């Protein structure tokens, strides 16, 4: 079973800081809105396992959660410690949301 976290729980993880937060959406979507400290690795550019640390947990998110679940399953099968944000960025309403409107 794949580990998931709620959008509300994500703030706690961000404050802890001991993970990589990966946004799987396009560069354009990332520029419009993303979660602070996220690394943008669009799905098409993500070579499973390439350039990803295996010694710290990964938290993945996408627009609604389905894409991040699929990618997380493949990464978990390769031995990565990975979680996904249920509902993706659409569900996130925490204080770390960065958008073009609030820059």
Q: Would you name each region that the model predicts?
A:
Residues 1-20, 27-57, 66-103:
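Rhodanese-like catalytic fold shared by cysteine-dependent sulfurtransferases
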Residues 61-62:
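Short, surface-exposed ligand- or partner-binding patches at beta-edge/loop junctions that are enriched
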